[in-house]
UniProtKB/Swiss-Prot annotation:
Organism this protein belongs to: Teredinibacter turnerae (strain ATCC 39867 / T7901)
GO BP annotation list: rRNA base methylation
Designated name of the protein: Ribosomal RNA small subunit methyltransferase H
Entry superkingdom: Bacteria
GO molecular function: rRNA (cytosine-N4-)-methyltransferase activity
Gene: rsmH
């Protein structure tokens, strides 16, 4: 397959933080176009192993091509939210111990730029937005059937869009004329309902982000996967996460902080010592892309890297 152009954000920083043992076994929860996976493989010895996940069929095709040329690598067509069961089977069969988990939560550039995937407010295409376009509800199906109150809630909650109610009203009014099935039509509807555009940001950005997050259950899956990773990792294992907007980063930051502090309970509640146990150690401060990377890839401007180690 011809490799599409995609820049893996914070590549060196994330892979250096992840790979502490060249003979170790690692998980890349979001293969995408394989930039991080290839960088991990470069740091692994012949004994090292990498297991990657993605629910996007196109990404899986690239991953299987890589698996065919490198026997240290395996590709799984599934969401990272299901990685614990896959890992349990692989670990039992091969007597593996997990050295680290990497989650790059960004949508890959090819996904954003391919009109037919339905993520873009810049290119017209069918209003889909599913990461796995072989199953589940499309954005168009939801947009054309959801109550106005649900539309407003999703756009506000997952897009942090202050004009969510206006956008929801506009969507309902327009879909009564005819179903909304194309990305540019939706982009125009929500843009016209946004009276105060943020400088340098398309007026449909937040609404499209919100709908994508909702359709793919991104925040629910992230929360569940962080908890799974903690259970899967042994002492010394690394959890490396790259987030791309404040909602994701808030979840990651809070999870790592809470697990580094240990559980908090109300005064007077009877607890055992293991219930108070600290389970993670955060490593350094959150990292952002440097000037050079920003110049090469403007989409890296919103990326935040956080790293923690299992105690």
């Amino acid at each position: 397959m011809t490799q599409e152009i995609h820049y893996s954000v914070l590549l060196k920083e994330s892979v250096d933080a992840l790979v502490t043992n060249a003979d170790g076994v690692y998980i890349d929860g979001t293969f995408g176009r394989g930039g991080h996976s290839r960088a991990v493989l470069q740091k692994l010895s012949p004994q090292g192993r990498l297991l990657a996940f993605d629910k996007d069929p196109e990404a899986v095709a690239y991953g299987r091509e890589l698996a065919g040329s490198d026997n240290r690598f395996s590709m799984v067509h599934d969401s990272f939210v299901n990685m614990a069961s896959h890992w349990a089977s692989a670990a039992h069969a091969n007597n593996w111990s997990l050295s680290g988990v990497l989650l790059d939560l960004g949508v890959s550039s090819p996904q954003l730029d391919q009109a037919e995937r339905g993520f873009s407010f810049m290119h017209d295409g069918p209003l889909d937005m599913r990461m796995d376009n072989s199953s589940g509800q499309t954005a168009a199906e939801w947009i054309n059937t959801a109550e106005e109150s649900e539309l407003a809630f999703v756009i506000k909650e997952y897009g942090e869009e202050r004009f969510a109610r206006r956008m929801a009203r506009a969507i309902v009014a327009e879909r009564e004329k005819s179903p909304i099935t194309q990305t540019l039509r939706l982009a125009n509807i929500v843009s016209e309902a946004n009276p105060k555009w943020e400088k340098g940001k398309h007026p449909a950005t937040r609404a499209f982000q919100a709908i994508r997050i909702f359709i793919n259950r991104e925040l629910d899956d992230l929360t569940a996967t962080l908890a799974q990773s903690l259970e899967m990792l042994p002492s010394g294992g690394r959890l490396v996460v790259i987030s791309f907007h404040s909602l994701e980063d808030r979840i990651v930051k809070r999870f790592m902080r809470d697990q580094a502090r240990g559980k908090q309970f109300p005064i007077g509640m009877p607890v055992t010592e293991d219930m108070l146990e600290k389970k993670l150690k955060t490593l350094g401060k959150a990292q952002r892309a440097g000037d050079r990377e920003l110049a090469e890839n403007i989409r890296s401007r919103s990326a935040t890297l956080r790293v923690a180690e299992k105690l």
